[in-house]
């Protein structure tokens, strides 16, 4: 049985990730890239508390698009601002702390 380094509880009972999701302020915005392609950027994710690769995988599947995790931010191909907010809220992030620009 593994013990969480942060809270000291067994990993099955650990609540560190849920607490981190409620506290973080996320920014979701779009930018134009090469050849006029639109990318949705999600930044403000603390990589130490949340598995950013797993979050990217879930967002790509729910938004039906390609994407990647780079430099502490998630990049999704296309304009998915509204869908990303819905998915993040379903995953436990507070909708009040998700800022859409």
Curated annotation (Swiss-Prot):
Origin superkingdom: Archaea
Keywords: Protein biosynthesis, Translation regulation
UniProt similarity note: Belongs to the SUI1 family.
UniProt-recorded name of the protein: Protein translation factor SUI1 homolog
BP GO terms, sorted: formation of translation preinitiation complex; regulation of translation; translation reinitiation
Example GO molecular function: translation initiation factor activity
NCBIfam families to which the protein is assigned, alphabetical: PRK00939.1, SUI1_rel
């Amino acid at each position: 049985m593994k013990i969480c380094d942060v809270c000291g509880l067994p990993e099955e009972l650990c609540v560190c990730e849920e607490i981190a999701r409620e506290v973080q302020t996320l920014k979701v915005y779009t930018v134009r890239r090469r050849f006029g392609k639109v990318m949705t950027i999600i930044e403000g994710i603390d990589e130490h508390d949340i598995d950013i690769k797993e979050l990217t995988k879930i967002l790509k599947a729910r938004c039906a698009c390609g994407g990647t995790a780079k430099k502490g931010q998630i990049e999704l191909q296309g304009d998915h601002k509204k869908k990303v907010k819905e998915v993040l809220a379903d995953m436990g992030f507070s909708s009040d702390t998700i800022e859409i620009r």
